Regions:
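Extended charged low-complexity segments that act as oligomerization/scaffolding linkers
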Residues: 15, 22-107, 284, 288, ...
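Non-catalytic, alpha-helical, charged scaffold/linker segments
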Residues: 65-195
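Long, positively charged binding patches that form subdomain-scale interaction surfaces
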Residues: 165-245
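Conserved aromatic-histidine-acidic binding/catalytic patches
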Residues: 15, 32, 36, 40, ...
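A short secondary-structure junction motif
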Residues: 5-16, 43-59, 91-92, 172-198, ...
């Protein structure tokens, strides 16, 4: 859908659907007026890195123009903060105040690891400005760099393909597979849970995984992650290399954003795995549908 937005700016003839073109124009106008936030994330950096030449330049320019400095925090950082909140409550340990906004203008918000600030004799105000300029210049450079970067194929997806094919797993009930999906999600992030516990001074016990599993409903992003895994496993979906990026970033966005636009496949499994929550699933597959939802929220 970013390509639709980009084409609506740089080559309108490539947007064949009139409704898509109109929706793109409305969304861009709202974003530039500050009425809606359309953030950039590190997933966009990964996706644009596979492109090159004019196509990449146009797409990157569109992302930078519409996002206006807004970023979605790294899903890894979001779920670590969710786990900190749970552990702080369970062990009655006060957590240090932290910036919790998932969508932020803070320098380096979309990074998984905090940038190491170089030693400087600059006054605090100027040092802060320098840090912000460096952070946003980095986003610009990464997105606009015309060099094509080959995608790295991780083995994460094959683990779940193997689980789906396992006869013992296939014999389990749908309910048990959903439970297993959440358990696998907690297992995936357990090292992050350990880091969260250590940062709070909480003893790392064998029951850490059980504590996180029992409280998964109170962790929006991790809950979506677990429920999507369970849904796809019980439906024997084929796992592709890019699924990890989609589930991490779209799942995190779905947990916190008002409206999320995704490709049809991701929209389908996010909607079907949503289950009973306080609000309906915000994920849609078509840009006009997203604009319709936003229009209702803005009225």
């Amino acid at each position: 859908h970013w390509s639709t937005l980009s084409n609506s700016i740089f080559d309108r003839t490539r947007v064949r659907d009139k409704e898509d073109l109109e929706a793109a124009g409305r969304l861009i106008a709202w974003a530039e007026a500050g009425r809606v936030i359309v953030p950039v994330s590190s997933a966009h950096a990964l996706e644009t890195s596979a492109l090159y030449n004019e196509r990449r330049q146009n797409l990157a320019a569109t992302i930078l123009r519409i996002s206006r400095g807004w970023q979605m925090r790294s899903p890894v950082m979001v779920r670590m903060r969710e786990m900190k909140g749970v552990l702080s409550d369970v062990y009655s340990v006060p957590a240090a105040p932290d910036e919790l906004d998932v969508f932020s203008l803070a320098a380096g918000a979309m990074d998984t690891k905090r940038r190491v600030a170089s030693a400087s004799d600059l006054p605090p105000g100027l040092a802060k400005l320098t840090n912000r300029l460096t952070a946003f210049s980095t986003i610009y450079d990464v997105l606009m760099n015309p060099e094509r970067v080959p995608s790295v194929v991780a083995g994460w997806h094959e683990h779940f393909n193997n689980v789906s094919r396992d006869p013992e797993f296939r014999a389990r009930s749908s309910k048990q597979k959903s439970i297993d999906g959440r358990a696998m999600a907690v297992s995936d992030v357990l090292q992050e849970g350990v880091a969260a516990a250590l940062s709070l001074g909480v003893p790392v016990e064998e029951r850490l995984a059980s504590v996180l599993y029992a409280r998964i409903d109170s962790m929006p992003s991790l809950r979506v992650y677990g429920d999507v895994i369970g849904h796809r496993l019980k439906n024997r979906a084929k796992w592709e290399p890019n699924d990890l990026i989609d589930i991490l970033f779209l799942g995190c966005a779905a947990a916190y954003a008002d409206v999320v636009v995704a490709e049809r496949t991701a929209t389908d499994y996010l909607q079907r795995s949503w289950g009973s929550r306080d609000r309906s699933c915000p994920v849609v597959a078509k840009l006009p549908e997203a604009v319709g939802k936003l229009s209702h929220l803005l009225d």
